[in-house]
A protein has these predicted regions:
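Surface-exposed loop/interface segments of Gram-negative outer-membrane beta-barrel transport/assembly proteins
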Residues: 1-7, 48-53, 59-147, 163-189
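Outer-membrane beta-barrel strand-turn architecture
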Residues: 31-32, 67-70, 154-160
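Beta-sheet entry/capping signal
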Residues: 25, 159-164
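Residues embedded in well-ordered regular secondary structure
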Residues: 1-51, 87-91, 131-139, 153-155
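Membrane-embedded beta-strand positions in outer-membrane beta-barrel channels/transporters
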Residues: 23-25, 59-61, 147-149, 153
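Generic alpha-helical hydrophobic packing signal
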Residues: 36, 41, 66-68, 77-79, ...
């Protein structure tokens, strides 16, 4: 009936959107012959093409340098964070493989879990890739990375110097994912 009526569901448009991002940065430098500093901040937001997918990065750094006659000491500290949300719609290829005569929801607006092809057996079915997004899932990650580098250089004379570098780094990760009992991964269990 849908074929005869010219029905053509846009499965490719269902999980997608126009993604627009933004980037901002600020850099400040200053000092004197002996002391110098550099501070920077940046923010980068990327809105993914799949609905519900986005990334936000924030980075900041501070550098201080002392340059004496024989001694040079510099310290650089940087902190970066990343917040990431994956699309609840899953893979785009799942939507590209869908039959255009199927709809993601039934007449009452309820999500359809699986479809059977009218010319195939009852045991041959296709999962609705939109189903899991409609039942409320999320998958988010976040990390914070802190780095510190201290460099010391002592000029013994014009031809020789001694230098040392100490660097420390620490990363904190957090992940949060949720799928309700009605999620397709629990079907039949």
């Amino acid at each position: 009936e849908k074929v005869d009526n010219g029905f053509n569901y846009d499965w490719l448009g269902y999980p997608t959107r126009t993604g627009v991002g933004q980037t901002h940065s600020l850099n400040v430098m200053g000092g004197s012959e002996i002391w110098r500093f550099n501070a920077s901040l940046s923010y980068d937001e990327t809105v993914g093409v799949m609905k519900g997918s986005d990334r936000a990065n924030f980075n900041g750094s501070l550098g201080i340098t002392y340059q004496g006659e024989k001694l040079i000491v510099s310290e650089n500290l940087s902190v970066g964070t990343n917040n990431n949300a994956n699309s609840p719609y899953g893979d785009f290829s799942s939507f590209a493989a869908m039959n255009r005569y199927w709809e993601p929801q039934d007449e009452e607006g309820e999500p359809i879990l699986t479809y059977t092809h009218p010319l195939r057996s009852e045991t041959s079915y296709s999962d609705n890739p939109a189903y899991n997004a409609l039942v409320g899932v999320w998958n988010k990650t976040r990390y914070t990375n802190m780095r510190s580098a201290t460099q010391v250089r002592y000029n013994i004379n014009e031809s020789f110097y001694i230098s040392g570098l100490l660097g420390l780094s620490r990363m904190f990760n957090q992940a949060d994912a949720f799928a309700p009992p009605s999620h397709a991964q629990f079907a039949g269990k």
